[in-house]
Design a protein with these regions (language model features):
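Intrinsically disordered, low-complexity, mixed-charge
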Residues: 1-91
Length: 91
């Protein structure tokens, strides 16, 4: 399963990307996460269906210092060959 998600709310400046990388690594999920200029956090999640669903559920709360107001989830069709979960440059 491959999912592209965009998380809105108080999600920048609160450690959300590092929190998400840690949770993804715990669940053996690959992909990336980055801040968007719009103030959102964007991520690509690749892995087991159940584990990705669990991670998306965790993202609805986020780390204790965040306040998530919305998550947009889309299927991702393109190939992604990296077998790690990375924090990448802002967009």
């Amino acid at each position: 399963m491959k999912k592209h998600i965009v998380i809105s709310g108080k999600v920048q400046g609160v450690g959300f990307r590092y929190w998400l990388r840690n949770k993804a690594n715990q669940k053996n999920i690959y992909g990336w996460v980055r801040n968007k200029v719009s103030g959102e956090v964007e991520a690509l999640l690749i892995g087991n269906d159940a584990k990705i669903s669990d991670l998306i559920d965790l993202c609805k709360k986020g780390p204790s210092s965040s306040k998530v107001t919305k998550i947009v989830i889309q299927n991702y069709q393109e190939d992604y060959l990296n077998k790690s979960f990375d924090i990448i440059g802002d967009q």
